[in-house]
């Protein structure tokens, strides 16, 4: 029997130091007919800006920059221990900084200048991970990454001559502890049995009820779903981390690590996978959702501007120096380049029209370095802006845009909204494959700007989609995955996509799948729902072949607790050392 069910789309505020979104609702409602058994919820109260503004930062339990000093002391002490040990005697320390329980340092001081290599020996059918710096020295300090929890891990140090000839090896056993009981472990739907690669899926599954208080964890999963890296959950989690250079990664700093009592983070940190924090930079305004590492070494970060009643419509370009504050070189206000259209499904949809009109959730730089793209969820638009801050193009359904934006709207080759081409809706995670091909995570929210033609959840879907953008401002859809799964993968509020050139494959994080307790599909309904997340790697072929599928889900019908994943990064544990 058909029922009327109230659909209220949330405007989500994802803080840099949080792994969940705090979402506000507006009071007006509209209805769609839904044939699922989703529960009907009462209308929420009318919320004001005070309800959705980011909470105050609170007090700091420890000045964040002392963390760098503490970690430097730990590292220097380990170097000293290696140098004072007997010559050619390995020294090891698991989780040296208390932040990465599946990582270690090993060191050895040789009697003459040599090269050293560390090899992590896997079990049957598992890849062997190895790292060999080019440095010739007597004191070797090597990161050991990709260990298993609660396991006697076999590690080998191989010494090479200055010319690279193996001279001898040392075998070590590193016994790791079990991970925290609360650490989420995926159900493995499909996993590789052979032809393994070294990459891990770095994700932050958060357990909780809807968008309420979450219990986040940041972990790295191999292609069998085994956890091979983890961040200490007592220090929080980061929703996003990306490999940078010299072994370092960049990440939004977890709130607990910063010593904060709540609120969203203003900190970007550089760390390595052994857990050492190398640098921390503070921004003037809140950091959120995404950052891109640019070809010139700078970073572009989604942030808030100084306006008191606008959020998530600004990007800064910053140089990372040895000073404690971000050196901001450029600021882009989206309102200066883009004339907005009425928000998706009009203002009744609860998108906080005065505050969160754009909702920037993704940034990437074109491989040529001439322009950047910015994903605006609440405009269902991916916007390209040239380096001189002029508008280049808009990837969006053409309905509702001001006339001045018409010349910039990409025009599809192939029939609009057909089997050959579909627009993206509420999208996340723009990723360039090359200068002309762009991936998006197409969340699919309603697939319309009007309720009369909106797609209800039980008929909807989310996709990984690849577009080709031509120089004449035409656009083609050249590849996709997800529509064939229907509502089973419908994730209306978060998600991500990444292209893996090494294997010509695509990884999708369907991280915000929304259902009710009984497992029926739902949009974000009156603020309460149950999350599930799928991490899926597929071949970049037509049709795509599923290579790996890992699921985080709570099927207990007596609880609303589930799992969400904001986004993911796919990389070998040693990839930052080769950048």
PLM regions and their residue ranges:
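Gram-negative bacterial Sec-dependent N-terminal signal peptides
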Residues: 1-21
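Sec-dependent signal peptide cleavage junction
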Residues: 19-35
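Short intrinsically disordered, low-complexity segments
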Residues: 10, 25-26, 114
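Short beta-strand segments within Ig-like beta-sandwich modules, predominantly Fibronectin type-III
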Residues: 131-137
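Histidine-/acidic-rich catalytic cores in large beta-rich domains
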Residues: 41-116, 120, 137-141, 145-152, ...
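Low-complexity "stalk/linker" and mucin-like segments enriched in Ser/Thr/Pro/Ala/Gly
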Residues: 85, 125-131
């Amino acid at each position: 029997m058909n029922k009327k069910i109230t659909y209220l789309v949330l405007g989500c505020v994802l803080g840099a130091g949080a792994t969940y979104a705090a979402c506000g609702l507006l009071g007006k409602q509209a209805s769609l007919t839904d044939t699922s058994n989703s529960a009907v919820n009462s209308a929420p109260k009318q919320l004001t800006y005070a309800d959705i503004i980011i909470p105050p930062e609170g007090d700091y339990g420890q000045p964040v920059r002392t963390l760098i000093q503490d970690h430097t002391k730990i590292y220097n002490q380990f170097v000293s221990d290696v140098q004072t040990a007997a010559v050619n005697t390995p020294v090891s320390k698991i989780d040296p900084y208390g932040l990465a329980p599946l990582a270690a340092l090993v060191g050895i001081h040789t009697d003459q200048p040599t090269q050293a290599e560390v090899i992590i020996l896997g079990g049957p059918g598992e890849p062997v991970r190895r790292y060999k710096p080019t440095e010739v020295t007597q004191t070797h300090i090597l990161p050991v990454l990709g260990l298993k929890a609660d396991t006697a891990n076999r590690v080998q140090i191989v010494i090479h001559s200055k010319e690279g000839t193996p001279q001898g090896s040392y075998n070590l056993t590193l016994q790791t502890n079990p991970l925290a009981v609360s650490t989420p472990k995926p159900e493995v739907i499909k996993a590789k049995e052979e032809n393994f690669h070294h990459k891990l899926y770095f994700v932050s599954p958060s357990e909780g009820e809807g968008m309420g208080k979450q219990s986040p964890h940041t972990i790295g999963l191999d292609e069998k779903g085994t956890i091979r890296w983890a961040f200490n959950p007592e220090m929080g989690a980061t929703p996003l981390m990306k490999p940078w250079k010299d072994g370092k990664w960049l990440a939004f700093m977890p709130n607990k690590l910063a010593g904060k009592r709540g609120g969203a983070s203003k900190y970007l940190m550089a760390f390595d996978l052994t857990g050492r924090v190398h640098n921390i930079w503070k921004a003037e305004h809140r950091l959120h959702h995404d950052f891109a590492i640019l070809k010139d070494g700078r970073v572009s970060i989604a942030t808030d501007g100084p306006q008191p009643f606008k959020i998530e419509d600004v990007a800064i370009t910053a140089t990372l120096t040895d000073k404690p504050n971000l050196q901001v070189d450029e600021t882009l206000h989206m309102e200066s380049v883009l004339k907005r259209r009425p928000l998706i499904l009009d203002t009744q949809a609860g998108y906080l029209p005065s505050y969160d009109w754009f909702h920037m959730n993704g940034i990437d730089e074109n491989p040529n370095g001439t322009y950047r793209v910015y994903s605006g969820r609440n405009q269902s638009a991916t916007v390209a802006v040239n380096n001189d801050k002029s508008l280049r193009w808009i990837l969006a359904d053409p309905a509702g845009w001001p006339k001045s934006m018409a010349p910039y709207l990409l025009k599809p080759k192939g029939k609009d909204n057909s089997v050959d081409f579909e627009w993206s809706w509420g999208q996340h995670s723009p990723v360039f494959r090359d200068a002309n091909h762009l991936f998006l995570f197409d969340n699919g929210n309603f697939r319309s700007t009007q309720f009369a033609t909106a797609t209800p959840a039980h008929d909807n879907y989310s996709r990984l989609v690849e577009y080709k953008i031509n120089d004449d401002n035409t656009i083609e859809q050249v590849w996709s995955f997800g529509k064939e799964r229907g509502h089973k993968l419908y994730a209306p509020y978060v998600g991500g996509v990444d292209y893996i050139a090494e294997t010509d494959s695509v990884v999708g994080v369907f991280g915000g799948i929304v259902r009710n307790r009984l497992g029926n599909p739902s949009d974000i309904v009156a603020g309460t729902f149950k999350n599930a997340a799928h991490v899926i790697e597929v071949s970049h072929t037509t049709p795509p072949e599923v290579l790996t599928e890992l699921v985080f889900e709570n099927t207990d019908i007596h609880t609303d607790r589930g799992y969400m994943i904001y986004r993911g990064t796919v990389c070998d544990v040693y990839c930052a050392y080769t950048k």
